[in-house]
């Protein structure tokens, strides 16, 4: 039997409505089957809450037990009216500064998952992110699919980036987000043993498609719930103006609904540093 779990949300679902939004594998707003969990590729929820899964879909499922076994999460506590804005792939010289300006305007702190190669190119932007009170996370050095690299390359991607960010931001980030949301169990095990925490997302704005501010706003407002981790991007150039502009709508409207914007260390009650 499949079960749909949906905590009280800031904005109720419109049952049966398809939105341009996708999810990482996540523990809330998902369909469960035994020890496995799967989220729909789009937020299409039938009115009777039932989904017919094909047998071959099982190959793409992630064991839900990983969330319990390792320092691994998709969203925060659903009993707190908190949401976290997160931005991947930066920094750059065009959109990251615009995002920082918007966050400062709205007095909101966020978490930026940075690529090591981009941090090397734009060190002053890394320093600005840190100096303005935002949290920096590790998004690997060159954005590989970690599920397709060997163990040595995986560790090198993380440690090399950590060294760069430590030098520029003044601390070694605790938080990792794997590119594409892809990670293997042995990689999770190593990261947990090294005192990292891996955080995916529960709401994907799909801003990388170059969609409009209104589409992004509808994606976020229609799918956010207490504990939501919202995924946006601060790079690549040429596609993200809609994501920047959407912040002027997302932030005040979620605040009006009672949401507090927090960083990931605050949401998970831990340090921003790997110690």
From Swiss-Prot:
Record PTM text: Hydroxylated on Pro-179. Hydroxylation alters the active site and enhances significantly deacetylase activity, probably by creating a more favorable environment for transition-state stabilization. It might be autocatalytic.
Modified residues (2-hydroxyproline): 179
Keyword Cytoplasm: no
Active site, per annotation: 88 (proton acceptor), 233 (proton donor)
Domain NodB homology: 81-262
NCBIfam families: PgAcgDacpgdA1_Bac
Protein name as it appears in the record: Peptidoglycan-N-acetylglucosamine deacetylase BC_1960
Organism expressing this protein natively: Bacillus cereus (strain ATCC 14579 / DSM 31 / CCUG 7414 / JCM 2152 / NBRC 15305 / NCIMB 9373 / NCTC 2599 / NRRL B-3711)
């Amino acid at each position: 039997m499949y079960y749909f779990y949906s905590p009280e949300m800031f904005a109720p679902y419109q049952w049966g409505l398809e939105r341009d939004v996708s999810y990482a594998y996540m523990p809330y707003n998902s369909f469960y089957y035994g020890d496995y969990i799967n989220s729909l590729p789009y937020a299409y929820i039938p009115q009777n809450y039932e989904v017919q899964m094909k047998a071959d879909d099982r190959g793409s499922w992630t064991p839900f037990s990983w969330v319990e076994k390792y320092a691994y999460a998709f969203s925060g506590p659903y009993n707190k009216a908190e949401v976290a804005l997160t931005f991947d792939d930066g920094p750059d010289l065009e959109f990251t500064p615009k995002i920082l300006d918007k966050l400062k305007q709205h007095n909101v702190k966020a978490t930026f998952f940075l690529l090591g190669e981009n941090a090397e190119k734009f060190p002053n932007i890394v320093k600005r992110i840190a100096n303005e009170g935002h949290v920096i996370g590790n998004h690997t050095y060159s954005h590989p699919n970690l599920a397709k690299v060997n163990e040595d390359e995986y560790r090198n991607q993380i440690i090399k980036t950590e060294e760069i960010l430590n030098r520029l931001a003044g601390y070694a980030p605790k938080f990792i987000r794997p590119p594409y949301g892809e990670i293997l169990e042995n990689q999770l095990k190593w990261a947990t043993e090294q005192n990292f925490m891996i955080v995916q997302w529960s709401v994907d704005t799909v801003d990388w498609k170059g969609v409009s501010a209104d589409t992004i706003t509808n994606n976020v407002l229609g799918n956010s719930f207490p504990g939501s981790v919202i995924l946006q991007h601060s790079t690549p150039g040429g596609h993200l103006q809609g994501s920047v502009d959407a912040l002027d709508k997302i932030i005040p409207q979620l605040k009006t609904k009672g949401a507090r914007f927090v960083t990931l260390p605050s949401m998970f009650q831990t340090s921003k540093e790997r110690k």
